[in-house]
Amino acid sequence: MYGLDPVNTRISFNIRYFGTPWVSARFPDFGGQFVLDRHGAASRVDVSIQMASVDCHDSYWNDRLRSPDWLDVQRYPQMSFHSEHVEFQGSDRAVASGELNLHGITRQVELEISQLSCPAASAAGDTCSFVAHALVKRSDYGFAHGLWIGGNQVDIAISGVGVRRDASPRNAEAPPAQSTSATGNLTRLR
């Protein structure tokens, strides 16, 4: 089992604002795990994000994003992604097809995983690093407010490092994702 390193893992979203380059905000409160099986159907990806943790380094916009006009975190406190189908595309790329639940709406999306590196050992023990992106349309999830300001396309991005916790990942069953403030699990089958 691999636990996400809270120091080296970042979950964020990126969106265009009035035609500017991408503007981003991060979600420091998250949980999740991966089981990656190149030879069978045991692959699984689960990620959950606490929406109230959104942080764009501006208190005014943090409050606005949490409000009913935008993320409505009181009504929709969590965003989650679940996949049981991961298609590997070479040694360092994969696509996890699954369901993204956001703002009370669940839709099929693809989480594109790149720079996947799971060396057998490192100085700190076994690690696994990756970058992942999912492109979604805000309008698909009921976000009509401000489409003219910020555009419709949102890039949800994860840059992560997992640190091995379980000495026997082959036989480990992935538990459901649980949010634990910038911690999570990343499991890999060899």
Predicted regions and their residues:
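Low-complexity, acidic/polar, glycine-enriched regions of mature
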Residues: 1-190
